[in-house]
Swiss-Prot record:
The gene is Top1. Eukaryotic topoisomerase I and II can relax both negative and positive supercoils, whereas prokaryotic enzymes relax only negative supercoils. SMART domains: TOPEUc. Transmembrane segments: none annotated. It comes from the Eukaryota. It comes from Mus musculus (Mouse). This is DNA topoisomerase 1. GO terms for biological process: animal organ regeneration; cellular response to luteinizing hormone stimulus; chromatin remodeling; circadian regulation of gene expression; DNA replication; DNA topological change; embryonic cleavage; response to cAMP. Its main location: nucleus. There is a cross-link at residues 103, 105, 119, 136, 150, 155, 160, 166, 174, 206, 338, 551, 644, 702, 714 (Glycyl lysine isopeptide (Lys-Gly) (interchain with G-Cter in SUMO2)).
Length: 767
């Protein structure tokens, strides 16, 4: 018997095929060997195990009963088949139960009990139900673990084929279907990922398509988080010293903070100006202790060098930061913006323009401002007035502080306000230019300017008649209105002496600001203007005027000193009241807006050539814009890097010219080859070279246009008029008419600001 265990698989199988009588040989296999063979080939193991003499009593008994039934008649054979089928079904049910018990046990261990599995249906968790073949490992595990498991009977060839066929059908029917489902799921995933951001994107609020609020009402609901205050002062390191009269001096925290403001500007032109130094020293002494006041009596003896070097080093260190450090700062700023940079207005999330309170520092002002150098004090929560709706959550002040006041005024557009200490003016936190409130204000401004178009001829006729009036007051008003209309001058506000810089508008012109020339440069009746305009920008212009205007100016200047007012019977109040009488809503700014927009529209019609390419059309647009900027006196100092940038641009132009010359030589050579060869290949080469030449010519033209544009704009600020005085619908219509991408004219911020114009305007729009 033990010798039979040494037979290999092939010998056993050969003996089985040669003679069926070997079925009842007395050979036994130990349990481990039997299960190993069962694992390799299930069907073969079943056949062998049937003819084995089991060591278990149940197996021997069953084997004897089978031998008896072998010699019975046909009816006994049928009974045997029936018995085998029943036995097969019983084992199948036991194993399915075993597999089910294992699954239930596992699910209970995981803390849940799942519902019965439905055949061929996917699980709730997204996985497909395993087919019958997937249960095999559980069966094998069961066979190996159960020592009392009964040996399997021989399967006939038909039964084996039937099982194989069913197995293949199950594979085709059950496996393929879930695979397809899984495949579909995988294919759908990228679509879901693509759609997700779209859902998260906020839909642009088309407020211009909605009904407007009643007059005076700005909003119905307003909620925000309040302002972000400047960080507290961080004292200087001990190694950074302040010197007075050559000796080290330790400053108190308040005095040190103000000293750092001056140190940061040490290399700036401001710190050399006497008025700046005087105002700074006066305010600095207010922050000193008594001992410091007694010691520090002369600003010239103060040495801020180490402080200045420290801040320069800090600035340089920020420039040398790693990408990771810069990214961290960017993320912190974005987090701050997300929390404080938006408000909810009438169920829409609106961007806030300036949610950070300006830090303390030294006032600079524009031009030669009399208050430059004064200390801008730190704004505290106790200075702040909050504005929100009654049903909104009031923003919380910083711990240990409280707001000055909380208001619920829906007739104003500001969210936060406070009074600054230099001019005593009120500062505001407002919404971004792309918001509904700002957009509506812009739209209304340009519509008012369009209304002026209908009555401007009548107004012009009226002020021409008034030049002949018997009243000096009426004559002065008429000449001032002529200047506002023709030269786009600002009206000019009344100012308290010594409070602001000496800037001039139309009504505040003095005799010293104009010179009269009966003839100049071949033109008659020329008025030469020279005065400091807004932001102390010099306004210089020589303008030929009508004879009656010239005569009136001579009359206004009679018996006056240079510092006397030119229009001594006129002020802005009188002028504005007269403008309101002429047309509701009319101001000097409306005249500027009207003249700027009309000028742009006329210039675009004159300068745009239909056959020009896009870069040339953009140059035409910038030239039209430049005409408006000159009209409105929107000047600027040439950028510090202007010469360097022009040199770089010229280098690019020269390099492009060299490339173009090489490309043209290559084209000439290719054409010569094509004449000789006369084949398709050389023709293709010629076409390729032609395209290369055309491409380089276009690139060169773009660079040359860019150079021309920069040179012409070096002292002209195009942005001010584009943002504040030019009806954006003129630009949008022009872009649509001539196929110029709007991105070439408006940057992202400007496109957001003028979204209403971009959406509603077609190419036929007329201002």
């Amino acid at each position: 018997m033990s010798g039979d265990h040494l037979h290999n698989d092939s010998q056993i199988e050969a003996d089985f095929r040669l003679n069926d009588s070997h079925k009842h040989k007395d050979k036994h296999k130990d349990r481990e060997h039997r299960h190993k063979e069962h694992k390799k080939d299930k069907d073969k193991d079943r056949e062998k195990s049937k003819h084995s003499n089991s060591e278990h009593k149940d197996s021997e008994k069953k084997h004897k009963e089978k031998e008896k039934t072998k010699h019975k008649d046909g009816s006994s054979e049928k009974h045997k088949d029936k018995h085998k089928d029943r036995d097969k079904e019983r084992r199948k049910e036991e194993k399915i139960r075993a597999a089910g018990d294992a699954k239930i046990k596992k699910e209970k261990e995981n803390g849940f009990s799942s519902p019965p599995r439905i055949k061929d249906e996917p699980e709730d968790d997204g996985y497909f139900a395993p087919p019958k073949e997937d249960i095999k490992p559980l069966k094998r595990l069961r066979d190996e673990d159960d020592a009392d498991y009964k040996p399997k009977k021989i399967k006939t060839e038909d039964i084996k084929k039937e099982k194989k066929r069913k197995s293949e059908e199950e594979e085709d029917g059950k496996l393929k279907k879930p695979k397809n489902k899984d495949k579909d799921k995988k294919v759908a995933e990228p679509d879901n990922k693509k759609k997700k951001p779209k859902k998260e994107e906020e839909q642009k609020w088309k407020w211009w398509e909605e009904e407007r609020y009643p007059e005076g009402i700005k909003w119905k609901f307003l909620e925000h988080k309040g302002p972000v205050f400047a960080p507290p002062y961080e004292p200087l390191p001990e190694s950074v010293k302040f010197y007075y009269d050559g000796k080290v001096m330790k400053l108190s925290p308040k005095a040190e903070e103000v000293a750092t403001f001056f140190a940061k500007m040490l290399d700036h032109e401001y710190t050399t100006k006497e008025i700046f130094r005087k105002n700074f020293f006066k305010d600095w002494r207010k922050e000193m202790t008594n001992d410091e006041k007694n010691t520090i009596t002369n600003l010239s003896k103060c040495d801020f060098t180490q402080m200045s070097q420290y801040f320069k080093a800090q600035s340089e260190a920020r420039k040398q930061m790693s990408k990771e450090e810069k990214l961290k700062i960017k993320e912190e700023n974005e987090k701050l913006l997300k929390e404080y940079g938006f408000c909810v207005m009438d169920n829409h999330r609106e961007r806030i323009a300036n949610f950070k309170i300006e830090p303390p520092g030294l006032f600079r002002g524009r031009g030669n401002h009399p208050k430059m150098g004064m200390l801008k004090r730190r704004i505290m929560p106790e200075d702040i007035i909050i504005n929100c709706s009654k049903d909104a959550k009031v923003p919380s002040p910083p711990p240990g502080h409280k707001w000055k006041e909380v208001r619920h005024d829906n007739k104003v557009t500001w969210l936060v306000s406070w009074t600054e200490n230099i001019q005593g003016s009120i500062k505001y936190i407002m919404l971004n230019p792309s918001s509904r409130i700002k957009g509506e204000k812009d739209w209304q401004k340009y519509e008012t300017a369009r209304r002026l178009k209908k009555c401007v001829d009548k107004i012009r006729n009226q002020y021409r008649e008034d030049w002949k009036s018997k009243e000096m007051k009426v004559r002065q008003r008429a000449v001032a209105l002529y200047f506002i209309d023709k030269l786009a001058l600002r009206a000019g506000n009344e100012k308290e002496e010594g409070e602001t810089a000496d800037t001039v508008g139309c009504c505040s012109l003095r005799v010293e600001h104009i010179n009269l020339h009966p003839e100049l440069d071949g033109q008659e009746y020329v008025v030469e203007f020279d005065f400091p305009g807004k932001d102390s920008i010099r306004y210089y212009n020589k303008v030929p005027v009508e004879k009656r205007v010239f005569k009136n100016l001579q009359l206004f200047m009679e018996n006056k000193q240079p510092e006397d007012d030119l229009f001594d019977r006129l002020n802005t109040g009188i002028l504005n009241k007269h403008l309101q009488d002429l047309m509701e809503g009319l101001t000097a700014k409306v005249f500027r807006t009207y003249n700027a927009s009309i000028t742009l529209q006329q210039q675009l019609k004159e300068l745009t050539a239909p056959d020009e390419n896009v870069p040339a059309k953009i140059l035409s647009y910038n030239r039209a814009n430049r005409a408006v900027a000159i009209l409105c006196n929107h000047q600027r100092a040439p950028p510090k890097t202007f010469e360097k940038s022009m040199m770089n641009l010229q280098s690019k132009i020269d390099a492009k010219k060299d490339q173009l010359a090489d490309a043209r030589r290559d084209l000439k050579s290719a054409k010569a080859d094509a004449k000789v060869m006369k084949d398709a290949k050389t023709k293709k080469v010629v076409e390729s070279k032609k395209k290369a030449v055309q491409r380089l010519e276009e690139q060169l033209m773009k660079l040359e246009v860019q150079a021309t544009d920069r040179e012409e704009n070096k002292q002209i600020a195009l942005g001010t008029s584009k943002l504040n005085y030019l009806d954006p619908r003129i630009t949008v219509a022009w872009c649509k008419k001539w196929g110029v991408p709007i991105e070439k004219i408006y940057n992202k911020t400007q496109r957001e600001k003028f979204a209403w114009a971009i959406d509603m305007t077609d190419e036929d729009y007329e201002f």
